[in-house]
Every structure is written in C-alpha cells, then in structure tokens.
Amino acid sequence: MSAPEVDQSGEIGHVHHPQRQVLLDFMKHLKLNGFLRYSYPMPDQERGEGWMLFLYERLSDDIINSFEA
C-alpha cells in the first residue's frame, strides 16, 4: 500500500491518499506520537478523487517517515 502524500508547503498542511482507511490509520499514528491538531478525512474535492485531511501544526519528518501504511 502506498504512503500518504504529505504537503506542508503552506500555512495549513494537508495529507492525501486514495483510501480513507489509510488516512484514519495515519491519524492514529499522529495521536500515538502526541500530535492532535488535524482534521478528519474528507473527500478530496480539489482533485476529484481520493481523500484528504488538514494539518494544523507542522509535522516532523520523523513522524511522517515512521508511518507504515
């Protein structure tokens, strides 16, 4: 399974993936690592397919890279 696509280039970051369950698992991973500032997954209307969630605080590369989908 592919890893979620994390984009933190703007003031509010976002995470994209074709499967909602991967984002739910990513949320659990964030919570286990003490990160609680994110939205719930929603359909990705900008891309027209897949799912996305918002990040309201910058993630470290270690947290992103330690996630296994």
Locate each region found by the language model.
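Intrinsically disordered, low-complexity segments enriched in polar/charged small residues
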Residues: 25-26, 42, 63
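N-terminal acidic leader/helix
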Residues: 2-32
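Helix N-cap motif at beta-to-alpha junctions
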Residues: 19-22, 56-62
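Acidic, low-complexity, intrinsically disordered interaction modules
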Residues: 32-54
